[in-house]
Amino acid sequence: MGPEPAGATVRPTFAKSALIRSKIEGIDYAVNPYYGCLHGCRYCYAAWMTRRRFPDHVWGLHVHPKVNVHRLLDRELSSARPGLLGIGTSTDPYQSIESRFQLTRRCLEVISHHPGFDVSLLTKSPLVLRDLEVLRAIDAEVGFSVSGLGDAVRLLEPRAPPGEARLAALRRLSSEGLRTFAFISPVLPGVTDRQIRTLLRAVAEARPSKVLVDALRFRPGVLQSMRSALSSSPDLLRELGSYASDQAWWLQRARAEMEEAAAGLGLSLEFLF
């Protein structure tokens, strides 16, 4: 949640629009206050989307704050048909530089003046707690994505806050009465499947309103990026190769193990694969 990592390039920019029609089922509009994300997660599907706009950028080391996004949002919501706003569909709205630019907060404040729009926000950062009161005021739903706990996941999430910190923040928001969800995504071979019971127990203790689970999907460049990140870990490379060679079998096995563990915890899981 602190300053941007060494070597990062932050270049403020002016966006042309704030609302984007979403292709995600159930979400009408996407709102992303930043181009790029400093978390640098090596499995992120948004990396290739950012590279299309900025071909020379290194994923995780370049970010463009959309410094006018809140003003655009105010204007566009005035004429948009009411619907669900998904905040953070291709960036983390609470990545470290949000503490400096406060663009996500400003967007939330704008939304509070436009009744009729629901909000579902996804993050990996406890910085979201800063905005608890405005999130409560607009009855926002807040989700945290988490694929694993401890050091096992760090090679693939080099600058994201630890999973334990995310779940602690999730528990705080749940205890404050906000609608919350845990998003176990992506299910990572050699990581998520090796700590299913531990992870699901920690998720259950955070008391989310719901728990979603999604698969690792190989968007353009993702497999290559993951292989590079895991080059120092032969075991994880082998697990990744096993998944890549037979995703259907691997996911069927992982789902069965997760369902069994969740049943023992009284936890209901909603699978998106």
Give the role of each language-model region.
Residues 51, 86-95, 126-129, 141-160, ...:
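Conserved radical SAM core fold
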Residues 120-121, 187-197:
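Active-site glycine- and acidic-residue-rich loops that bind
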Residues 1-141, 149-151, 167:
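Conserved Radical SAM active-site core
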